[in-house]
Amino acid sequence: MELTPQQLSQYNGTDPSKPIYVAVKGRVYDVTTGKSFYGPGGPYAMFAGKDASRALAKMSKNDDDISPSLDGLSDKEIGVLNDWENKFQAKYPVVA
């Protein structure tokens, strides 16, 4: 299953009948079990329904950084992103 950014945005936690998805490096994870983190009011709610790769790499919650773009990231930031990717892979099922 592949999701467009528009389709992914429908899984942002605002509809309790739908799961919550976050994408990292183009891979979409079902983070519904982490609803307290990614659901409305959670500390990472801004990532729900989006590809948060750049923001995770930069350890940023800034809307401008919530993007799949890895352009211009430092080696250190890529390493941070890889660590996040490993955490997501270990904790959440891949859906797309």
Regions found by a protein language model. Give the residues of each.
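Histidine-anchored, small-residue-rich loop motif
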Residues: 1-96
